[in-house]
Structure formats: C-alpha cells, structure tokens
Amino acid sequence: MNIIGIDPSLNSTGWAILSVNDNNYNEIRLVNNGSILTSNKKTIGERLNKIYSELLNILNSYKVDTASMEEIFINKNPKSSTLLCYARGILLLTLDVACIPLFEYSANRVKKSITGNGHAKKEQVCFMIENILNIKCYGTYDISDAIAVAICHIYSIKAF
C-alpha cells in the first residue's frame, strides 16, 4: 500500500510517499519525497494551480492508495491562516479528483505516535523518523512533517 503524507503550505507543500507491506505494517519504506514550491511573485491562482497539477502528477505516478495530513490549526496571523486554508483547499480538491481518501490527524497525535510525546520538538520527530525508516532526516521540515503524518497514519491502521 502506498500512502502519501502531506504538509500543506502555499510556499512549500511537503509530501512523502511511504510504502507499507499489507501483511506486516512494520515494513515501512520511504519511496520518494519532495516539496511543491511556489513563487510569491505569482498570483494565488497560479500558485494553487501549480500545487494542484504537481500533486495530481505525484498521485498518479506513485499509485497512491490513501493520504494523510495534519488537521488545520489557526495561526495568530490571520493572513497566514488564510493562505494555509487556500493551500489545504486545493489539496483536498486534488485528492478528491484523484479519488484518494484522506485521513487527518492533530499535530499532537502525529508527534505522540512518532515520539511518544505530543509536544515533541521537530528535531525529536526527525530523530525518530531516522530510526523508524533507517534514513537520514534531511531537507526541510515540510518534508519531515509529511513523513511523520504518513507514519502516524500507518500506525493508526496497524492499531486496528
């Protein structure tokens, strides 16, 4: 089964494809990851279109079965929250167009499932990702956050 974890952002949407063995949920493998980058010099419509088209291409290329994303949170800055909502909206639309079910988790649940601590720092989450997947946690936090939410989803499936 292929699961995509998504960390939404209008500037840099992180994504990670994890593959898990249907018979052994402890066999988790990182297939690929990256960021969908948009320029703030473009219109919001152009930026959302880029997120839509790139994510749709990723979903089709990797035959994704399910998606996971952190639940929305409201930032103290209303403009930042609004831009995040735009990005989330286009991500939800893209997943719906591709007929991929979405599972959402709170940030605290993601951190707790990965580290055992719902208030863990990003460095602690990266450390655990390295141990779980036997990889070097590199790149930006948008990618590690995407990996973390995908692992959280796998652990949630495994619990049932």
Curated annotation (Swiss-Prot):
Keywords: Cytoplasm, DNA damage, DNA recombination, DNA repair, DNA-binding, Endonuclease, Hydrolase, Magnesium, Metal-binding, Nuclease. It holds the Pfam family RuvC. GO terms for biological process: DNA recombination; DNA repair. GO terms for cellular component: cytoplasm; Holliday junction resolvase complex. Mg(2+) 1 binds at residues 7, 142. It is found in: Cytoplasm. This is Crossover junction endodeoxyribonuclease RuvC. It comes from Ehrlichia ruminantium (strain Gardel). The lineage of its organism: Bacteria, Pseudomonadati, Pseudomonadota, Alphaproteobacteria, Rickettsiales.
